[in-house]
Design a protein with these regions (language model features):
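Hinge/lid segment of periplasmic solute-binding proteins
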Residues: 8-30, 35, 76-78, 102-159
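Extracytoplasmic/periplasmic solute-binding protein
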Residues: 33, 92-98, 102, 140-161, ...
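Short, polar/charged alpha-helical segment
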Residues: 42-67, 166
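Pocket-flanking alpha-helical
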Residues: 78-115, 129-148, 188, 192-202, ...
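Short, solvent-exposed loop/beta-turn-alpha elements that line the ligand-binding surface or hinge
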Residues: 122-129, 180-182, 235-255, 318-324
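Glycine-centered hinge/linker elements that transmit conformational signals in sensory
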Residues: 191-194, 227-275
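Extracytoplasmic/periplasmic substrate-recognition and gating elements
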Residues: 302-369
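Conserved C-terminal helix/tail region of periplasmic/extracytoplasmic solute-binding proteins
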Residues: 337-346, 356-442
C-alpha cells in the first residue's frame, strides 16, 4: 500500500468465519474435554464476566455458522493420556478436541494419543486469526501436537513481574512502568534495583527471612521458575524449530553466559531464601521488592493488603528481546487420534479459533484491567506482556518425552542450581537424542 494510506483493516471474528468453508453440521454436538471447567462453555450467570461473555459469543458464532452446539466435558488434570487410551481401546471418540495443560498434552502426545495437527484436514495453524507467533512455537519439524493462544487462555500463564510500589517508591524508583518500557529493562537492572532496595540485608552474614527486606522471589522457587528465567535469555534448545528437523541448536557461548548470569541472580542475597506462603507474606508485608510469577496470580495478590504494580519480565540482556514465557501449566488444544470425522474436526477447530479471534484476547486483557490494575500505565504494561507471550517447543514437550527433557529442562534446571558447563554436560546425551530425533517430530 502507498505511504500514508490507511493501515490494513483487521477482520472481525464474524468476518473471519465468513472466509471458512460452508458445511451443514446441524445437530452435531462439538465436544471439548477440558481441565478448565467453564472456560469453553461458561455456567449461566445473572452477571457473566468479560471472559465468559467472549466465550459465549464464540460459541454462538460457531452455532450460527455450522448449526452445532459446543459442549464441555470435564477432564481431571493429569489423566488425559489414560482417558484417551481407554476411549481409543474401546473404539470410541473421546472428544473432538481437548483443552489441557501443556504437560498433560505432552504426556498424551508421547503416548501416541494425539494427532499431529498438520495431518488434520483443513486445520490451519498459520491462519491470521491464530495468536502469532505463539501458535507455531509448539511446532517441531512438520509436527505439532498442541496449539496455544488467546482462545486457549494461554496468556493467563505468562510469567510476569509484580513490584511492591511502596517499597520501590521509598527507594526512589517511582516510575517503574517508564523503565520497563525502555531498553534499560533487563534482568540485570531488576537485580540492581533489588540489591539496592535490600542493601542492608545484602550486608548481613545470615539474613532473617521473617524480618529483613529482600529483592525478589517467586511463589515456588521450583523448576517452572528456573525455566521461566531461562526463557528470558532467548536461547532455545531447538532454535526456531518450526519447519526445521529436530536437532539441538544451542548457541553454546550465549547459553553458557546466560546460565552463569542466571546462576548469579539465583545466588544473590537479594533472593528470598524461602518460598510459598512465606514469600507471599513477605511481599504482602512490604519486605520484598519483586515477585516473579504467573499473570493469573494477580487475583491472589489482589486479596493482599499491598500496593503492587505489574511489569513484563525483562530480557536477560539489552540486546535480547523480552518474552513473557509460558510454563507447563499453560493450557493448549490438542486432538485425540481417534476421530469419527477428521475433516469436520478440522473445519470446526478453525471456526473455534476464528470465532475467538481478537475479542477473546481483548476480554482476557479487559478482565485484568478491570479487576486488578490501577491505571493506564498498568494497562500498557499488560499489553506489552500479551504482545510478547512465547513458548519454547523443547520445554512444552519435555514433560512427556524423557529424551527431550534430558537435553533441555532437566539439564538446564540442574545447571541453574549447581553450575557447570552446558556443552560438556550435554555430551553424554547426544547419541540417544539423535536416535530419538530420527523417529520423532519428523
Amino acid at each position: 500500500s502507498a505511504a500514508g494510506s490507511e493501515p490494513e483493516r483487521k477482520l472481525s471474528a464474524e468476518e473471519w468465519l465468513e472466509t471458512l468453508p460452508e458445511r451443514d453440521y446441524t445437530g452435531y454436538v462439538f465436544t471439548l474435554a477440558t481441565t478448565e471447567t467453564g472456560f469453553v462453555v461458561p455456567a449461566e450467570e445473572d452477571e457473566p464476566g468479560l471472559v465468559d461473555m467472549a466465550a459465549v459469543k464464540r460459541n454462538e458464532l460457531m452455532a450460527a455458522k455450522y448449526g452445532i452446539e459446543v459442549r464441555e466435558k470435564a477432564l481431571k488434570t493429569g489423566t488425559l493420556a489414560g482417558e484417551l487410551k481407554t476411549a481409543r481401546t474401546a473404539g470410541t471418540q473421546y472428544a473432538d478436541a481437548v483443552l489441557a495443560p501443556a504437560r498433560d498434552l505432552a504426556a498424551a502426545a508421547a503416548a501416541g494419543e494425539l494427532l499431529n495437527l498438520y495431518s488434520l484436514p483443513y486445520f490451519d495453524l498459520s491462519a491470521e486469526y491464530m495468536t502469532k507467533p505463539l501458535s507455531t512455537d509448539s511446532v517441531i519439524g512438520s509436527t505439532c501436537y498442541a496449539v496455544f493462544g488467546s482462545a486457549t487462555g494461554a496468556e493467563n500463564s505468562a510469567w510476569v513481574v509484580y513490584y511492591n510500589r511502596t517499597l520501590l517508591d521509598k527507594a526512589g524508583y517511582d516510575s517503574m512502568e517508564k523503565l520497563a518500557a525502555s531498553e534499560e529493562w533487563t534482568l540485570g537492572k531488576l537485580r540492581e534495583i533489588a540489591e539496592t532496595v535490600a542493601a542492608e540485608t545484602m550486608d548481613k552474614r545470615s539474613p532473617d527471612s521473617s524480618h529483613d527486606i529482600f529483592g525478589y522471589s517467586s511463589y515456588y522457587n521450583d523448576d517452572e521458575f528456573l525455566l521461566s528465567l531461562w526463557q528470558t535469555s532467548g536461547v532455545r534448545a531447538f532454535g526456531d524449530s518450526a519447519g526445521q528437523p529436530l536437532e539441538l541448536r544451542y548457541d553454546y557461548e550465549k547459553a553458557q553466559s546466560a546460565l552463569d548470569t542466571l546462576g548469579a541472580f539465583l545466588d544473590s542475597k537479594a533472593m528470598f531464601p524461602a518460598s510459598g506462603q512465606s514469600a507471599l507474606n513477605a511481599f504482602g508485608e512490604g519486605r520484598l521488592a519483586f515477585f516473579i510469577y504467573r499473570l493469573d496470580f494477580a487475583s491472589v495478590l489482589a486479596e493482599q493488603d499491598v500496593d503492587w504494580g505489574l511489569l513484563p519480565l525483562p530480557a536477560l540482556s539489552a540486546d535480547g528481546e523480552a518474552v513473557s514465557p509460558l510454563d507447563g501449566l499453560t493450557c493448549g488444544l490438542g486432538v485425540p487420534v481417534l476421530q469419527e470425522d477428521s475433516e469436520r474436526t478440522g473445519i470446526l477447530l478453525n471456526a473455534f479459533f476464528a470465532a475467538s479471534h481478537a475479542h477473546m484476547r481483548q476480554a482476557l486483557m479487559n478482565n485484568y484491567v478491570h479487576f486488578y490494575l490501577s491505571d493506564n500505565d498498568q494497562a500498557l504494561m499488560l499489553e506489552r506482556i500479551f504482545d510478547h507471550v512465547r513458548a519454547d517447543a523443547a520445554l512444552l514437550y519435555a514433560p512427556g518425552y524423557t529424551n527431550i527433557a534430558a537435553v533441555s529442562s532437566d539439564l538446564l534446571t540442574e545447571l541453574l542450581r549447581n553450575g557447570g558447563s552446558l556443552e560438556s554436560r550435554l555430551e553424554p546425551h547426544l547419541a540417544s537424542f539423535e536416535n530419538f530425533a530420527k523417529t520423532n517430530f519428523r
